């Protein structure tokens, strides 16, 4: 039993090491709608995986990476706003996923539950290994391009003047966010995966004086939320992923009490 809890907690902690820093860019660039649409569009990958009887994790990754590439391509080749593009592609993916779900049996539909709501208490040793490799790879790329991502976020025009390939940097950032959400979906579910990026990062703003400190505090707040959420879900027999998000929201409210009062 303790091994199960530890693996679940470790998976959550590993996730926060990438969701924390990347969540900052979602807040700074006001991309929460992008992450939310991405999470919901993953339903297409999940439903395809169940229909074809293949591992959902890889199908979800493929689907959302396709989603991300379509966003990048349309954003730079059309005059449509990003919100419009997100709406068109997101609802197209979501509706196709719902069509597939309605065509599969009730037995197969039961397999969708974990990917819709997640379950950190079903994490295996193989999941941990995959997660470690994924997190290290994403963190390496993020650290390598950190300064350029900050510059393009603060002032893309200035970045262009300095010779920065803004399209390349933005594409890398979208790719990292897309991949991170795809990984997070396996553990905390597609319906609330984006919350693990947004809430800790928003909370960290209250305690930070630099981007690096904000990234650090975002990870710490994420770990606190994961730990608290797992303990509450086990003690009170609650759904683990929503409990973690709820605990994260409470931390956010507490951090803003002084400002509210």
From Swiss-Prot:
GO cellular component terms attached to this protein's record: ATP-binding cassette (ABC) transporter complex
Entry's localization field: Cell membrane
InterPro entries: ABC_BtuC-like, ABC_TroCD
Keywords: Cell membrane, Ion transport, Membrane, Transmembrane, Transmembrane helix, Transport, Zinc, Zinc transport
GO biological process, one term: response to zinc ion
One Pfam family here: ABC-3
Family: Belongs to the ABC-3 integral membrane protein family.
Protein role: Involved in the high-affinity zinc uptake transport system.
Name used for this protein in its record: High-affinity zinc uptake system membrane protein ZnuB
Organism: Buchnera aphidicola subsp. Baizongia pistaciae (strain Bp)
């Amino acid at each position: 039993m303790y091994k199960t809890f530890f693996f679940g907690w470790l998976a959550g902690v590993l996730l926060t090491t990438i969701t924390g820093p990347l969540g900052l860019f979602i807040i700074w660039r006001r991309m929460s709608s992008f992450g939310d649409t991405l999470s919901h569009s993953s339903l297409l990958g999940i439903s395809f995986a169940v229909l074809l009887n293949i591992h959902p994790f890889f199908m979800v990754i493929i689907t959302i990476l396709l989603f991300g590439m379509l966003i990048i391509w349309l954003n730079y080749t059309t005059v449509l706003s990003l919100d419009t593009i997100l709406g068109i592609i997101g609802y197209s993916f979501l509706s196709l996923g719902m069509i597939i779900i309605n065509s599969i049996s009730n037995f197969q539909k039961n397999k969708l539950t974990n990917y819709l709501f997640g379950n950190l208490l079903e994490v295996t040793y193989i999941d941990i290994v995959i997660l470690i490799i994924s997190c290290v790879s994403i963190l390496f790329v993020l650290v390598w391009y950190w300064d350029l991502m900050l510059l393009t976020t603060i002032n893309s025009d200035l970045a262009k003047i300095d010779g920065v390939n803004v399209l390349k940097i933005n594409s890398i950032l979208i790719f990292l966010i897309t991949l991170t959400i795809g990984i997070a979906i396996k553990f905390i579910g597609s319906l609330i995966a984006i919350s693990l990026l947004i809430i800790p990062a928003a909370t960290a703003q209250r305690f930070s004086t630099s981007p690096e400190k904000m990234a650090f505090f975002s990870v710490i707040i994420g770990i606190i939320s994961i730990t608290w959420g797992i303990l509450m879900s086990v003690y009170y027999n609650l759904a683990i992923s929503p409990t973690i998000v709820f605990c994260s929201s409470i931390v956010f409210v507490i951090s803003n009490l002084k400002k509210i009062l």
